[in-house]
């Protein structure tokens, strides 16, 4: 059985996390905002988790996954806007932010969560990198991976829950690419095999 060190995806994400940590150390901000975007299955969540575990500044960092904000399978755009309005804009002004978790089983909003403006924040998810967040985020990451490998990883992760929605979600991601050009807004592009 191959070790994790032989996994090219894990290796690419570790290398990217180290480079992003350098980017963060180079900022003047004590509470930076980082956004991580890319297609489903690209490695955004894994990258955010690696970065949080190796956060380069004193103190902890808040990690928020848009999967917790999207209001259902047709909610890519709405989930990203909820993050902008409830998390990124308040954080950028030094104000307490908040967001409500989406309960996928009940198909409704659930409990609220506060976002401390004195701490750094990582917001990861498809659709988060757009002109409105480019003006707010200190570090903007685009994670790029081929569609076949992304789909294989996403379906391995979520299986039959995601399978019937893959095309529906992918269409929203394509619309995001056409409308917002996230790759061009990134301060760093991460390529994952």
List each language-model region with its residue ranges.
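Conserved nucleotide-sensing/catalytic segment adjacent to the nucleotide-binding pocket
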Residues: 62, 68-121
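ATP-dependent NMP and nucleoside kinases share a basic, alpha-helical "lid"
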Residues: 111-156
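Small-molecule kinase domains that catalyze NTP-dependent phosphoryl transfer to phosphate-bearing small molecules
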Residues: 108, 112, 130, 159-193
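Hydrophobic positions on the alpha1 helix immediately C-terminal to the Walker A/P-loop
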Residues: 47
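Extreme N-terminal, non-catalytic leader segments
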Residues: 1-34
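P-loop (Walker A) phosphate-binding loop of NTP-binding proteins
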Residues: 39
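Post-Walker A helix-loop "phosphate-sensing" segment adjacent to the P-loop in P-loop NTPases
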Residues: 53-62
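Conserved lysine of the Walker
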Residues: 44
């Amino acid at each position: 059985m191959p070790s994790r060190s032989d996994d090219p995806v894990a290796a690419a994400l570790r290398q990217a996390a180290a480079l992003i940590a350098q980017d963060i150390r180079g900022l003047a901000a004590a509470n930076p905002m980082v956004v991580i975007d890319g297609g489903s299955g690209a490695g955004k969540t894994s990258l955010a988790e690696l970065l949080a575990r190796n956060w380069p500044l004193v103190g902890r960092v808040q990690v928020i996954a848009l999967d917790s904000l999207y209001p259902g399978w047709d909610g890519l755009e709405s989930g990203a806007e909820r993050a902008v309005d409830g998390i990124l804009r308040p954080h950028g002004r030094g104000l307490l932010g908040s967001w409500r978790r989406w309960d996928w089983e009940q198909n409704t909003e659930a409990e609220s969560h506060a976002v401390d403006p004195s701490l750094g924040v990582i917001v990861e998810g498809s659709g988060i990198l757009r002109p409105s967040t480019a003006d707010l985020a200190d570090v903007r990451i685009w994670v790029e991976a081929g569609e076949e490998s992304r789909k294989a990883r996403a379906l391995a992760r979520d299986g039959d829950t995601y399978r019937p929605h893959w095309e529906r979600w992918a269409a929203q991601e394509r619309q995001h690419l056409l409308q917002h050009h996230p790759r061009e807004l990134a301060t760093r592009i991460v390529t994952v095999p």
